[in-house]
Amino acid sequence: MKISCFLLLILSLYFFQINQAIGPDTKKCVQRKNACHYFECPWLYYSVGTCYKGKGKCCQKRY
């Protein structure tokens, strides 16, 4: 019983969190094959815009 309740809790949290922060900026970033990060971009990436309704950064690989 405990395991089934735990799994139900995990599944409900997972499905309720999907697409909560997705806005037009996140969609545009992902369509351009870039990566969204909440904090600074990783070392080999640079910031090209925002994600998560302005709370994150859209990062593109340096070539």
UniProtKB/Swiss-Prot annotation:
Disulfide bond in keyword set: yes
InterPro entries given in the database record: Defensin_beta-like
Family: Belongs to the beta-defensin family.
Family annotation (PANTHER family): BETA-DEFENSIN 38, BETA-DEFENSIN-RELATED
Encoding gene per record: Defb38
Disulfide linkage: 29-58, 36-51, 41-59
Organism of this sequence: Mus musculus
Name of the protein described by the UniProt record: Beta-defensin 38
Pfam families per the UniProt record, alphabetical: Defensin_beta
Tissue: Only expressed in epididymis (caput, corpus and cauda).
One example of a Gene Ontology biological process annotation: defense response to bacterium
